[in-house]
């Protein structure tokens, strides 16, 4: 019973860290990346549709993103959606493709992005700690029900704490790497 709680908590912590990594991918670090557009929804024939489903997105240069819509009539809608998403990007439309030049980040913008990274890191750590708390509660219920002994409870609780420390260290490492990437000029 206790092993199941351990396994479950491990999986949930892993998912929390993976979600954090995906979230960080959308933070612009001065280099062009198609993941910046992951959350952009285009009003396509009345239905909100992700840009990635409507166009081929390529990165021909380090600071340039090219969006080639499958349906040329949707080019205006895609451009509007990118502007509306307020990503600090200025798309230019030549009728067949949309080009987005990524300007070099200012020192102030870099600091703002580092703050965002730290905020996301804190949210990920909270998620990991919540998993720890829930798992410890589950273990206490098992002990109360007589399914595990008090010694087992202590051992499993220590194991969960070790896992928590491991995943929080992972979040810190990911955050440190992203901050370094952002602060590179």
Curated annotation (Swiss-Prot):
<dbReference type="GO" id="GO:0006415">
    <property type="term" value="P:translational termination"/>
</dbReference>
<dbReference type="Pfam" id="PF01765">
    <property type="entry name" value="RRF"/>
</dbReference>
<comment type="similarity">
    <text>Belongs to the RRF family.</text>
</comment>
<keyword id="KW-0963">Cytoplasm</keyword>
<dbReference type="GO" id="GO:0005737">
    <property type="term" value="C:cytoplasm"/>
</dbReference>
<keyword id="KW-0648">Protein biosynthesis</keyword>
<dbReference type="GO" id="GO:0043023">
    <property type="term" value="F:ribosomal large subunit binding"/>
</dbReference>
<protein>
    <recommendedName>
        <fullName>Ribosome-recycling factor</fullName>
    </recommendedName>
</protein>
<dbReference type="InterPro" id="IPR023584">
    <property type="entry name" value="Ribosome_recyc_fac_dom"/>
</dbReference>
<comment type="function">
    <text>Responsible for the release of ribosomes from messenger RNA at the termination of protein biosynthesis. May increase the efficiency of translation by recycling ribosomes from one round of translation to another.</text>
</comment>
<dbReference type="InterPro" id="IPR036191">
    <property type="entry name" value="RRF_sf"/>
</dbReference>
<dbReference type="InterPro" id="IPR002661">
    <property type="entry name" value="Ribosome_recyc_fac"/>
</dbReference>
């Amino acid at each position: 019973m206790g092993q199941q709680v351990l396994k479950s908590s491990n999986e949930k912590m892993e998912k929390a860290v993976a979600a954090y990594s995906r979230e960080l991918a959308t933070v612009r670090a001065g280099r062009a990346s198609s993941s910046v557009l992951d959350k952009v929804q285009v009003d396509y024939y009345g239905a909100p549709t992700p840009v990635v489903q409507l166009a081929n997105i390529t990165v021909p240069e380090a600071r340039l993103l090219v969006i080639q819509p499958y349906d040329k009539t949707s080019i205006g809608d895609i451009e509007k959606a990118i502007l509306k998403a307020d990503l600090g990007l200025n798309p230019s439309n030549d009728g067949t493709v949309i080009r987005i030049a990524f300007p070099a980040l200012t020192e102030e913008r870099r600091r703002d992005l580092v703050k965002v990274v730290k905020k996301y890191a804190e949210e990920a750590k909270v998620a990991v700690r919540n998993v720890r708390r829930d798992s410890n509660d589950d273990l206490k219920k098992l002990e109360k029900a007589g399914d595990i002994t008090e010694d087992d409870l202590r051992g499993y609780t220590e194991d969960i704490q070790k896992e928590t420390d491991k995943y929080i260290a992972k979040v810190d490492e990911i955050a440190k790497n992203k901050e370094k990437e952002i602060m590179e000029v």
